[in-house]
Amino acid sequence: MNKQSTQKLPHVTTRRLHDMKSEGEKISMLTAYDYTTARILDRAGVDVILVGDSASNVFAGHNTTLPITIDQMIYHARAVVRGVQAETSRAMVVIDMPFMSYQLSSEEALRNAGKIMKENECDAVKIEGGNVIVDTVKRITDVGIPVMGHLGLIPQSIYKFGSYKVRAREEQEAEELLRDAKLLEEAGAFALVLEKIPADLAAEVTASISIPTIGIGAGGACDGQVLVINDMLGLSTEFHPRFVRRYAELDRVIFDAVSRYVDDVRGGTFPGEDESY
């Protein structure tokens, strides 16, 4: 792909992701919360852009993902979708359903999933949890809304588990996770995020289901990988877990640029003749 091209390309669909799994082609996924970042990600060839409820952390500064609302998620999603449409329109856009937007009942979940899909032009929603949300996933997918599942470490349940440690190290929890993955596939989920679980378990799950797995801290055997954009760009200097590979150190780059700007303004060298009319 020409990284600088804005030529419209075939849009990534659920069928395309399934084909990528069957053909052994890895799936790339990153988060985005704004128009500008979404344009860059789509132009760079990212397959799936996740409008993550991690916006609660990295965009709004909360300690958890719980505070963000459905209307705030839709606000971010609209910006991301416009960014993708302004470039190649290739990337699939998936939106996290935030905390308490799907837990009350399947009907409430369907209503909120429909609201998300109707109020922007996204491609799918993502829901956290295992067997307790299987009926909800089926209810939503039965009306034609694609659902991506999420197993392992599920950040919306952080207060239940008490930490962000690796999940499913014990045999019982590993067996439950494998069973939940199969149940979610049967319920109609088109893909699963596997977060912070042992690599060998992720490999077993990936081999046991026909839908793609997207790993984050789950080893290299998953069908794809996802990271939070702020983490992989080095914008979150206080957060550097083992599973994150930093591809840039933008905190330092931005700090240096802003410092030079401040110095130029204070020193009277900006604006100069070239920046004046």
From Swiss-Prot:
GO terms for molecular function: 3-methyl-2-oxobutanoate hydroxymethyltransferase activity; magnesium ion binding. Keywords: Cytoplasm, Magnesium, Metal-binding, Pantothenate biosynthesis, Transferase. GO terms for biological process: pantothenate biosynthetic process. 3-methyl-2-oxobutanoate binds at residues 53-54, 96, 126. Its EC number is 2.1.2.11. It is found in: Cytoplasm. GO terms for cellular component: cytoplasm. It catalyses: 3-methyl-2-oxobutanoate + (6R)-5,10-methylene-5,6,7,8-tetrahydrofolate + H2O = 2-dehydropantoate + (6S)-5,6,7,8-tetrahydrofolate. Binds 1 Mg(2+) ion per subunit. The active site is at 195 (proton acceptor). Its main location: cytoplasm. InterPro entries: Pantoate_hydroxy_MeTrfase (IPR003700), Pyrv/PenolPyrv_kinase-like_dom (IPR015813), Pyrv_kinase-like_dom_sf (IPR040442). Pfam families: Pantoate_transf (PF02548). It is an enzyme of class 2 (transferase). Pathway: Cofactor biosynthesis; (R)-pantothenate biosynthesis; (R)-pantoate from 3-methyl-2-oxobutanoate: step 1/2. Its cofactor is Mg(2+). Mg(2+) binds at residues 53, 96, 128. The keyword DNA damage does not apply. HAMAP family: PanB. PANTHER family: 3-METHYL-2-OXOBUTANOATE HYDROXYMETHYLTRANSFERASE. Catalyzes the reversible reaction in which hydroxymethyl group from 5,10-methylenetetrahydrofolate is transferred onto alpha-ketoisovalerate to form ketopantoate. Homodecamer; pentamer of dimers. NCBIfam families: panB, PRK00311.1. Belongs to the PanB family. This is 3-methyl-2-oxobutanoate hydroxymethyltransferase. The gene is panB.
